[in-house]
Amino acid sequence: MISLGMDSHDVLRAAVLHGGWLAWPVAALLLIGLWRCRQRKTRVALAGLCAATLLFLWARFAEPNLIVVRHTVLHGTGGTARIVLIADPHLGMFKGADFLRRVVARINPLQADAVLIAGDLTYEPQGQSLDTLFAPLAALKPPTYAVLGNHDEQKPGPEIDLALRAALRAQGVAVIEGRTTQVHGFELAGLGDRWAGKDDAGFLARIPSNQPLLVLAHNPDSADRLRPREYLLLLAGHTHGGQLRIPWLYRQVLPVHHGFDRGEQWYAGPRGRIRVYTTSGLGESGLPVRLFDPPVIDLLELRP
């Protein structure tokens, strides 16, 4: 129910979330009108409206429910490993345990050495059990590690970070913010969320400089916290790849300061260059739509 206190974004979100179904009869009426119409100008107008409506239906109901596996080989990492990187499932308002169960079913056959979750696991899950939402993670076969993102840390979002950490632990997921662990010959370190002011990387100084290092963070902008080293790869999410990947326009709304988008990029900072891989993520925030940017599981083949 839309209250008078809702702002324009809330009204738009409610309209897309709950009123989007009305686009189906609208599309049907437009197609019927296009078939019956004989006037050229009217047919062109109807065709344009029909195409726009069908594109909306795809972005609202089809693309957000796709799950694509993107396979990337990264050379020069200092070691060999098969890593699954996911981020931004945003369980809560738009997606739930059923979607996560499908994600797990796609990950398990990939025979990964580890699964890394780069934050934003939730999106306003008020009144929903976190244990129930994240129960499918218990079925993951590889060891699984996570950090939290801004929506998990009230930036913005409800105060759920402690409960979320407990729910993840209960499913066998290790939250590794501010600490390191070994993954198939790599040192894996986790950074807390940047918007929450928790991405201090000072603890990485104790890792030997010749040790291949993977850093898991939510926000790729955390690259500016790192010191260059021979073998270093930052793995992140947060950008959604634009979510609505309309050429040029999506770049104007990417929530980053250092120009990160998706895939492999390099951050050129005052200390030197940092290698970054950003996943497009699995879920949606703001509006329950994706366009030209389907939910993705990144399978990274790391090579020396």
Predicted features along the sequence, with ranges:
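Membrane-embedded segments
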Residues: 78-174
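Structural motif
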Residues: 83-85, 116, 188-190, 214-218, ...
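Active-site metal-binding loops of divalent metal-dependent hydrolases
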Residues: 87-91, 119-121, 150-152, 179-180, ...
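Conserved beta-sheet core of the metallophosphoesterase superfamily
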Residues: 220-299
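Binuclear metal-dependent hydrolase catalytic cores centered on His/Asp/Glu-rich metal-binding motifs
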Residues: 156-173, 179, 184-217, 223-225, ...
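Non-catalytic terminal accessory segments
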Residues: 1-68
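Beta-strand-turn-beta hairpins that frame and shape the catalytic cleft
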Residues: 74-84, 173, 180-190, 208-209, ...
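Conserved acidic residues
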Residues: 113-115, 142, 211-214, 232
